[in-house]
């Protein structure tokens, strides 16, 4: 396996950190990966170790304010910056792997980013994968939403702790500990980022009929961080005639780091194979 790191010119003045993993032989396809909130592109080692030896190259960036990329942790000016950053990574892959089938995948907040990206950018992609996409907020009261909107007008850059429950990412204690000990992870979100997430999920549902490319959506039924109902709803709303929705019984939020990851990764690879 060949591992490369680099800098990606995107929507910000400072470049973003990205990395790629390629098989020793020529790959048969490439997966473009957008990570979730508070984490980074280097946390997908099980996925990389499964797909790359089977001929699927993986490219991942660290979003602005995340991982090894610059920016205030959890900071964001507007959602379109995430969309532009995803597009920058897609365009990099088009330049570096011009003849390979291309798939884009997003997990959690990254799933929301990819879903919003697909509303206007599907050309040149063979399909998309959404892993536990953040398409419905968990127990956010109307009072909190109103307070967030008011704060967004006054102090959009204010960072707040999300108090993310690391124990909800996986049923494996070792994976929870690994998450907690990873210094590149954080639980900070700016008021603007929180508002943008609350704004974009309904927008994706409203315009979901525009998503017509092959789509795989999967979610754990035991996910305590992102409700599975948003994924079920999107699967019914998209315009694609080739949409697969899979619910994994008991699965926690990070299915690629959970107890049944071997099954999840095998299912992912099989879906990619069918769409080459």
Briefly describe each language-model feature range.
Residues 97-107:
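Alpha/beta-hydrolase fold nucleophile elbow
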Residues 38-40, 67-97, 264:
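Catalytic nucleophile-loop/oxyanion-hole region of alpha/beta-hydrolase
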Residues 211, 217-219, 223:
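Short beta-strand/loop motif that positions the catalytic acidic residue
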Residues 244-276:
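Catalytic active-site module of serine/aspartate enzymes centered on a nucleophile-bearing elbow/loop
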Residues 28-36:
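Short beta-strand element of the alpha/beta-hydrolase
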């Amino acid at each position: 396996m060949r591992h490369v790191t680099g800098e990606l010119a995107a929507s910000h003045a400072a470049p973003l950190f990205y990395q790629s993993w390629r098989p020793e032989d020529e790959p048969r396809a490439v997966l473009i990966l957008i990570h979730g909130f508070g984490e980074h592109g280097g946390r997908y080692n099980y996925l990389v170790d499964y797909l790359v030896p089977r001929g699927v190259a993986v490219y991942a960036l660290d979003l602005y304010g995340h991982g090894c990329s610059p920016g205030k942790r959890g900071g964001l000016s507007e959602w379109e910056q995430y969309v532009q950053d995803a597009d920058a990574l897609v365009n990099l892959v088009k330049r570096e792997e011009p003849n390979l089938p291309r798939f884009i995948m997003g997990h959690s907040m990254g799933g929301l980013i990819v879903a919003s990206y697909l509303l206007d950018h599907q050309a040149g992609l063979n399909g998309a994968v959404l892993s536990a996409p953040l398409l419905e907020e968990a127990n956010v009261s109307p009072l909190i939403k109103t307070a967030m909107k008011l704060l967004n007008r006054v102090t959009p850059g204010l960072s707040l702790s999300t108090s993310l429950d690391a124990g909800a990412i996986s049923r494996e204690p070792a994976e929870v500990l690994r998450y907690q000990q990873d210094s590149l992870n954080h639980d900070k979100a700016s008021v603007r980022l929180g508002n943008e997430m609350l704004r974009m999920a309904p927008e994706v549902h409203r315009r979901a009929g525009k998503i017509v490319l092959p789509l795989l959506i999967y979610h754990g039924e035991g996910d305590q961080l992102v409700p599975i109902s948003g994924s079920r709803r999107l699967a019914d709303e998209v315009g694609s005639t080739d949409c697969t929705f899979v619910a994994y019984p008991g699965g926690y939020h990070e299915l690629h780091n959970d107890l049944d990851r071997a099954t999840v990764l095998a299912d992912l690879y099989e879906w990619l194979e069918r769409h080459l």
